[in-house]
Regions:
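Beta-strand-rich domain onsets/edges
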Residues: 14-28, 34
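Short, ordered, surface-exposed loop/turn motifs in non-cytosolic proteins
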Residues: 27-29, 36-52
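A sequence-level detector for low-complexity, Ser/Thr- and acidic-rich stretches
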Residues: 116-246
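Extracellular beta-sheet/turn segments enriched in Thr/Pro/Gly and aliphatic residues
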Residues: 95-117
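Short Pro-Gly-centered beta-turn/loop motif in secreted/extracellular proteins
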Residues: 40, 68-78
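Short, acidic Ser/Thr/Gly-rich low-complexity loop/linker segments typical of extracellular
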Residues: 52-66, 70
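Short strand-edge motifs at loop-to-beta-strand transitions and within beta-strands
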Residues: 65-69, 108, 211-215
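A short, solvent-exposed loop/turn motif at the edges and junctions
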Residues: 52-54, 80-98, 213
Length: 246
């Protein structure tokens, strides 16, 4: 029997599940993130790109504040910088192509200002596989990838409903907030909406820009199925990512 208490991701496991895949590289975003007060490069900033076809990619700035992100085929890409305790200008950057995929080089710098309280409400970002809209998701207990069963008899206790761990950027609870302010829902192949109850939220050690969000698999859903999942908090809704059920 195994406890349902969600284990913390290790850096080695994180590297394994988020490892880059080979795909056609069509658009490159690069630039520098600086401290607005000193003008110096700002390290350890997560610059996150969200593509409408190839999903998400993350680059963390080096000690000089430099980053480079290479994206696959997309017609819409948004870019955002995140480091806890900072606000960034621009808040986000978006680019859309009507006649075909976005290509070429796109320089984009960000300027960060230290700010200890939340002043801009931004949607959390669900991480996906490279070149895919499939969520980076794990069985919270077994640490295996999808497709997930709805129930797992190896869990400890009588509640064997599968727990799913999602990886999210720019998502944390502030003073006075509880898990009740987070909602996760999934739309299945029949366009039916299902709630995935939230059970845990915590920072991934060694990656302060990433949190792991643990939810319960939904009730009363036909399988096999594919859920298109979103995370909502503070009136903001994340990008969509898919999770497979068996």
């Amino acid at each position: 029997m195994r406890s349902k208490c969600p284990p913390i991701l290790s850096p080695l496991l994180l590297l394994f599940i988020t490892g880059a895949h080979a795909y056609s590289q069509t658009a490159t975003f690069s630039g520098r993130v600086t401290d607005s007060t000193t003008g110096s490069g700002l390290p350890d900033v997560a610059v996150v790109a969200v593509g409408n076809q190839s999903g998400t990619r993350v680059a963390v700035t080096n000690v000089q504040g430099d980053y480079t992100l290479v994206m696959g085929t997309n017609t819409n890409i948004t870019l955002r910088a995140y480091r806890k305790g900072f606000v960034f200008n621009p808040i986000f950057f978006g680019i859309t192509s009507i006649g075909g995929p976005i290509t070429g080089s796109h320089p984009r710098d960000f300027s960060g200002t230290s700010f200890p309280i939340l002043i801009f409400l931004q949607a959390p970002i669900l991480l996906t596989e490279d070149s895919s809209l499939q969520a980076l998701a794990l069985d919270s207990v077994l640490m295996t990838r999808d497709p997930f069963p709805l129930v797992n008899p190896t869990y400890f206790g009588t509640d064997n409903r599968t727990r799913i761990k999602l990886l999210v950027v720019d998502f944390d609870l502030f003073s006075g907030e509880t898990l009740s302010m987070i909602s996760v829902q999934g739309i299945d192949n029949a366009a039916i909406t299902h709630a995935l109850p939230v059970e845990d939220l915590r920072i991934v050690p060694g990656t302060p820009w990433m949190t792991q969000l643990t939810v319960r698999a939904p009730e009363a859903i036909a399988t096999p199925n594919i859920l298109t999942i979103t995370v909502a908090a503070r009136g903001q809704i994340s990008n969509a990512a898919t999770v497979r059920l068996k």
